[in-house]
């Protein structure tokens, strides 16, 4: 099945501590999760690696969010939207279900 949310899509978070925040999808993971830029930040404790000249400390990173907790953002309606698929000129394209506009 084709992915409804892809890399570089602008999404809005539907549930969790970052609800109603918007961001760009940086990575889509095969286990049904996405990583969104600037959303779901966690603090990782990293050890120093002297061989690489890397200092240790606390590092903020984006954690994965389940794809069911994000929805694609429709810029014309300024709301979260659902995605549909249709064929145009023998190509499968994604479209917003609210206004039939191609993504």
From Swiss-Prot:
GO cellular-component term (any): ribonucleoprotein complex
GO molecular function, one term: structural constituent of ribosome
Alphabetized InterPro entries for the sequence: KOW, Rib_uL2_dom2, Ribosomal_uL24, Ribosomal_uL24_CS, Ribosomal_uL24_KOW, Translation_prot_SH3-like_sf
Keywords for the protein's UniProt record, in alphabetical order: Ribonucleoprotein, Ribosomal protein, RNA-binding, rRNA-binding
Alphabetical GO biological process terms: translation
Tagged with keyword Ribonucleoprotein: yes
SUPFAM superfamilies: Translation proteins SH3-like domain (SSF50104)
Pfam families hit by this protein: KOW, ribosomal_L24
Superkingdom of source: Bacteria
Function: One of two assembly initiator proteins, it binds directly to the 5'-end of the 23S rRNA, where it nucleates assembly of the 50S subunit.
Family, similarity comment: Belongs to the universal ribosomal protein uL24 family.
Assembly description: Part of the 50S ribosomal subunit.
The protein's name: Large ribosomal subunit protein uL24
Origin species: Haemophilus ducreyi (strain 35000HP / ATCC 700724)
């Amino acid at each position: 099945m084709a992915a409804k949310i892809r890399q570089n899509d602008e999404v809005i978070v539907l549930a969790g501590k970052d609800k109603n925040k918007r961001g760009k999808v940086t990575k889509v993971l095969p286990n049904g999760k996405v990583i969104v830029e600037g959303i779901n930040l966690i603090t990782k404790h990293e050890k120093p690696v002297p061989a690489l000249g890397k200092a240790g400390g606390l590092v903020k990173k984006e954690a994965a969010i389940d794809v069911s907790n994000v929805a694609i953002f429709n810029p014309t309606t300024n709301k979260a939207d659902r995605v549909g698929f249709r064929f145009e000129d023998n190509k499968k394209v994604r479209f917003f279900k609210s206004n039939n506009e191609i993504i």
